């Protein structure tokens, strides 16, 4: 293998373009991400990137290959309007031989070609030392910390009961009925969140098509008087969770409409989802929260969640 392999892409032009990877290419990158995630304990690609790869969305990507021709490293750059988000992943068996450096250099060229040098964010999932070194080598600085918090099995077994405000009821999501109402509440609840608040109907449909989606696990808080949606807790339990370790559930998203603040819905919804996942037999529960969202961090800490890992987002100063 070459010490500094030249990344290949599905686009033969010298000028960088946003393209759609072939299905077999996308599948290979997703398999690579699964291998790396299993080895590192941290998923190297965000859900949005995985969804785009799976559905054939448009993005820039580059890859390195081993002597057998198999993809052993990949960089994925997802355009978001005038900005972009970059993620890199290298097979655990192909590290420390220049794969990450080659991919980062190719991605930097792509960012320049796409005129997004000042608006591209780069994720270092798990803040692995190699990823942090690459970010610094390219003159990037951390601008955001995403904490991964975990609720232990003991804490999960000792959860307090759910207390709902008067006039509020809980129910499961109904496909074909609740999509627009959910999108409206999600957009309002996450108006300042760069990923969650921008979800579209297509994004929602893609997630509903995932094998882990469970309509009853997307809990909705509604006003009894008129059925108006006030908030939600979207839980996530992978079908094969627990196959190679603890069975992990996830607080995928908790959102409360701004005009329903003050009713204690954030705590009630979080607890309701945790109880449901406990009934499903999960061993522990994870969640992701921005470090500067002090109110949410305080809520989760009060329920027994502890810091487990962290992701860092880098950008040019």
Swiss-Prot record:
The keyword Nucleotidyltransferase does not apply. InterPro entries: Acyl_CoA_acyltransferase (IPR016181), GNAT_dom (IPR000182), Mycothiol_AcTrfase (IPR017813). It comes from the Bacteria. SUPFAM superfamilies: Acyl-CoA N-acyltransferases (Nat) (SSF55729). The keyword Cell wall biogenesis/degradation does not apply. It is an enzyme of class 2 (transferase). Keywords: Acyltransferase, Repeat, Transferase. Residues 14-166, 168-317 form the N-acetyltransferase domain. This is Mycothiol acetyltransferase. The gene is mshD.
């Amino acid at each position: 293998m070459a010490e500094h392999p030249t990344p290949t892409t599905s686009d033969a032009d010298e000028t960088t373009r946003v393209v759609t990877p072939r299905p077999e290419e996308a599948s290979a990158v997703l398999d690579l991400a699964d291998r790396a995630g299993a080895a590192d304990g941290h998923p190297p690609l965000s859900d949005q990137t995985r969804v785009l790869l799976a559905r054939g969305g448009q993005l820039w990507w580059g890859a390195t290959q081993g002597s057998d021709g198999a993809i052993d490293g990949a960089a994925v750059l997802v355009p978001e309007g005038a900005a972009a988000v970059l993620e890199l992943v290298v097979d655990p068996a192909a590290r420390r031989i220049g794969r990450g450096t080659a991919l980062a250099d190719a991605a930097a060229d792509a960012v320049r070609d796409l005129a997004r040098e000042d608006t591209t964010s780069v994720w270092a999932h798990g803040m692995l030392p190699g990823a942090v070194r690459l970010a610094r080598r390219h003159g990037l600085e951390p601008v955001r910390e995403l904490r991964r918090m975990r609720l232990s099995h003991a804490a999960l077994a000792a959860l307090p009961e759910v207390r709902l405000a008067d006039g509020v009821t809980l129910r499961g999501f109904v496909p074909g009925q609740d999509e627009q109402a959910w999108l409206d509440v999600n957009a309002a609840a996450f108006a300042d969140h760069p990923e969650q608040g921008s979800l579209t109907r297509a994004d929602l449909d893609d997630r509903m098509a995932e094998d882990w989606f469970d309509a009853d696990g997307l809990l909705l808080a509604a006003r009894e008087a008129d059925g108006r949606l006030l908030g939600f807790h979207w839980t996530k339990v992978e079908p094969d969770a627990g196959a190679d370790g603890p069975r992990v559930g996830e607080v995928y998203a908790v959102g409360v409409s701004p005009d329903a603040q003050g009713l204690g819905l954030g705590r009630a919804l979080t607890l309701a989802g945790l109880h449901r996942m406990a009934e499903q037999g999960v061993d522990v529960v994870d969640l992701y929260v921005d470090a500067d969202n002090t109110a949410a961090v305080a809520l989760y800490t009060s329920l027994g969640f502890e810091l487990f890992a962290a992701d860092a987002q880098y950008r040019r100063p």
